[in-house]
Amino acid sequence: MILVLDAGNTNMVLGLYEDKNLIADWRLSTDPLRTADEYSIQVIQLFLQSNLRLEDVEGVIVSSVVPNIMYSVEHMVAKYFKKKPIIVGPGTKTGINIKYDNPKEVGADRIVNAVAAHEIYKKPLVIIDFGTATTFCAVTQSGDYLGGAIAPGVKISSEALFEKAAKLPRVELMKPSSVICKNTVSSMQAGMTYGYGGLVDHIVSKIKQELMDSGEKEPLVVATGGLAKLISEESETIDIIHPFLTLEGLRIIYEKNKDLDA
């Protein structure tokens, strides 16, 4: 079995693969102050609840956009899984060509998503990841990662309203039945859900046009991340939701690098 781990700014997502099959997935909160032993308590408990054994894990791969968490994660893997994890970063074999001005600036999660989508769909792509930030990535059919756009995430936008506007409350992210709302909570929810659908469609339309102007066929638009389903209901451009795109990308990258890391 292969353990894949993606550490984002808000959540850490873990997946366990047997061959190409995802047999378990879990989500933990990301906390840079948590020690390797504290993370291990949670991970061991998750394994036990799923009737899985740590010693059956043959390899581990990690991607992270939170540098301060890596010491604890690497030591947790070394101490409790007795493995040296593959870390997605410069020098990792991915199978895509990064055309960024400075490739080191590209978040590991964006690279991993691009690897998965390119491998699965074999088409020009626009990839949207609804995380702490909402990222948009453009990938050619041949596997060139061209770059993209970054917008504030839906949740942090909602939190900013709560923190900066004295009379606006913290609200649950859900779609009201109408965009013409008659109370503050529903009005904020309408702005977040209906508004983000418009943001997504406008950025995606621009990226698709630039890709096609460069000679690519019409791109497939793939969305992932915790809020992909909610926002896609108000988007006219999203073609596919792949909830485990990042985990799948980590599995693919592991297969490309496991012998190199031996």
Curated annotation (Swiss-Prot):
Binding, ATP: 6-13, 132
Cofactor(s) the record lists: NH4(+); K(+)
Enzyme class: transferase
GO biological process, one term: coenzyme A biosynthetic process
Signal peptide, first to last residue: none
Active site, UniProt feature: 109 (proton acceptor)
Pathway recorded for this protein: Cofactor biosynthesis; coenzyme A biosynthesis; CoA from (R)-pantothenate: step 1/5
Keyword Isomerase: no
One term of GO molecular function: ATP binding
Role: Catalyzes the phosphorylation of pantothenate (Pan), the first step in CoA biosynthesis.
Assembly and oligomerization: Homodimer.
UniProt-recorded name of the protein: Type III pantothenate kinase
